[in-house]
Regions:
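A contiguous, surface-exposed recognition patch within enzymatic or periplasmic domains that forms
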Residues: 81, 174-177, 186, 268, ...
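Acidic, contiguous internal or C-terminal segments within carbohydrate-active enzymes
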Residues: 232-278
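Solvent-exposed N-terminal domain segments of exported/luminal and surface proteins
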Residues: 63-204
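Terminal accessory/anchoring regions of large secretory-pathway or extracellular enzymes
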Residues: 35-80, 89, 107, 346, ...
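N-terminal export signals
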Residues: 1-2, 8-30
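A mature extracytoplasmic/lumenal domain signature
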Residues: 123, 134, 232-236, 249, ...
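Extracellular structured ligand-interaction cores
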Residues: 80, 114-116, 154, 213, ...
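Extended, loop-rich substrate-binding clefts of extracytoplasmic carbohydrate-active enzymes
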Residues: 194-250, 365-380, 384
Length: 529
């Protein structure tokens, strides 16, 4: 799949996550009725996670069989507009009347979601397949979807708020739709960036591969405070896997995830806990965009907490070519794509960019050696997801290899473990270098990097603050630090002189004497003449 088609597909999963649909195959077993839902369920069968892991391992040793695509000539015509008119009847929600607290509704197949996904209700260690029926959906009389076979299948699902709430039918908080994508509304009740089960060869030669979640097992708790547990089987041309998601609805959403991954073929780039987002432009590169809004992005930076304890912040870019940045680490403490800028006036858009969630990946246990990789893809519009971040283990993902990882995803407004003893990057501002009143050289770029936080607020008035700046190439000059007027922030100012078209890697942080005051700001400068 090309980068262009990939980005359109990924973005569509988020757009459609605001419409309703349903998901599994027609059960061939003796049917039963789910409580108060009208859903038809198959006969119960024993289920355990380790049995699912064993199935994934066995699948990796066999030839890949793609998920079913019923009537592809019909499904391809169910475009975004047509798909949005197909709505699942919420009265048929799984657990709408209990015993589980969090009802599930399902997505219909469509142009961007052509593969069927089997759905199971899980309770007491017994799984029952949920049979698909077109009667679960409302659709226009002339909908092309009416031409699909009655045994088609579902595309995905979403979880609703507790059925103890009177508004649960219109309020959802998690959606799984398309390949292995999923997303949540975070703590600000707004969908934005997404995660995936796995990323395969995102920037490797030969094109990216998108394995699919092919089966879901949904186990909703009966008691408040307990998680919704989702089990998933993953399969693709080069990999198979089994996943367990324990999803907790807190002030945001917290997911405890365990995965077992088995390689069917060699993979050059295996991405664990991949995050996908959109960055079109921000205050520091709007000069290259034409739009009435000051900023347009779902996330504005990659934050990292290294195994050595260093805090890093890398503002995102919209480059002129595909760029992959690797940050080598061992046993990382966390990383995430964040939306730090929460000021509405910085966006001025009714689609709530100021409320888009941040997602933080917190490894559980030791992940060993590897690298956090950031992929930035050129885009000329907000409809394309063009940012990807994931962990790539040092261990080769060769045929026959296996991996097991545990991690926690925090979907909220900010990172879950901020450093009180370290100021954070508040803003990155970029302009023409040189001195006022003199000709401005084309190969010089001026940076203003603002920092904010307790260590700066607590400085004595006579404190001397210094910026430690380094560059991979080129020259640093006109270095200056000062308090930002009318605020409690500090900023570092400096010029970067470049001598060629190659990207320049920059690092900067603030110190006072022997005390480090801030996280490390990192930036990739792409000279543009």
């Amino acid at each position: 799949m090309s980068h262009v088609s990939r980005r359109v597909f990924v973005r569509s999963t988020g757009l459609v996550a605001s419409a309703v649909g349903l998901a599994p195959f027609f059960a061939k077993l003796t049917p039963a009725r789910a409580k108060d839902s009208g859903l038809t369920l198959g006969k119960p069968a024993p289920f355990t996670f380790e049995a699912l892991v064993a199935r994934a391992q066995k699948a990796a040793s066999a030839a890949y069989v793609p998920p079913a695509r019923p009537a592809p000539e019909v499904v391809k015509k169910i475009d975004y507009e047509a798909h949005g008119k197909i709505r699942f009847k919420v009265d048929h929600a799984l657990d709408g009347g209990g015993p589980g607290l969090y009802p599930a509704t399902f997505f219909h197949l469509g142009q961007f979601f052509q593969k069927t996904v089997k759905m199971y209700s899980l309770r007491g260690g017994q799984a029952r397949e949920i049979s698909y029926s077109p009667s679960y959906f409302d659709m226009p009389a002339d909908s092309i979807a009416k031409k699909l076979p009655k045994t088609s299948g579902f595309a995905g699902f979403r979880l609703h708020e507790s059925n103890k709430r009177t508004d649960w039918k219109t309020q959802d908080w998690v959606a799984f739709l398309g390949a292995s994508y999923f997303r949540t509304i975070g703590s600000l009740n707004q969908y934005g960036l997404s995660s995936r089960g796995l990323a395969v060869n995102t920037t490797a030669p030969g094109g990216e591969e998108f394995p699919d979640f092919t089966e879901f097992y949904l186990e909703s708790p009966e008691k408040e405070g307990e998680p919704v547990v989702i089990y998933a089987l993953l399969d693709g041309p080069s990999v198979s896997g089994a996943y367990r998601f324990a999803c907790r609805r807190t002030t945001g959403v917290v997911m405890d995830i365990e995965c077992a991954v088995f390689m069917r073929n060699d993979v050059a780039q295996l991405g664990i806990s991949p995050l996908t987002s959109m960055f079109w432009f921000s205050e520091y590169d709007k000069q290259f965009r034409i739009d009435w809004r000051p900023e347009v992005h779902d996330s504005d930076g990659l934050a990292m907490w290294t195994g050595a304890g260093e805090r890093l912040w890398r503002p995102l870019n919209n480059p002129t070519r595909v760029v992959t940045s690797s940050f080598v680490d061992k046993n990382p403490r966390g990383f995430g794509l964040l939306q730090r800028d929460r000021v509405f006036e910085h966006y001025l858009d009714g689609v709530n960019y100021d409320k888009r969630p941040s997602c933080w990946v917190e490894p559980v246990g030791e992940w060993g050696a590897g690298s956090v990789q950031l992929v930035e893809i050129p885009t000329d519009d907000e409809i394309h997801d063009n940012i990807v971040a994931f962990w790539v283990p040092e261990k080769a993902a060769s045929k026959g290899a296996s991996f097991r990882f545990k991690y926690r995803l925090h979907w909220q407004g900010d990172e879950p473990h901020p450093a009180d003893n370290s100021a954070r990057v508040y803003a990155t501002r970029i302009g023409r270098g040189g001195e006022p009143g003199k000709p401005r050289p084309k190969n010089v770029t001026k940076f203003y990097v603002e920092f904010a936080g307790k260590p700066l607020e607590q400085l004595p008035k006579d404190a001397k603050v210094e910026a430690k700046i380094s560059t991979s190439k080129g020259k640093i000059s006109y270095v200056f630090t000062e308090p930002v007027p009318s605020t409690r922030r500090w900023r570092a100012q400096f010029d970067v002189t470049t001598d060629g078209p190659e990207p320049v890697e920059l690092r900067a942080y603030l110190v006072s004497g022997k005390q480090t005051l801030s996280e490390t700001w990192m930036y990739q400068l792409e000279p543009r003449g």
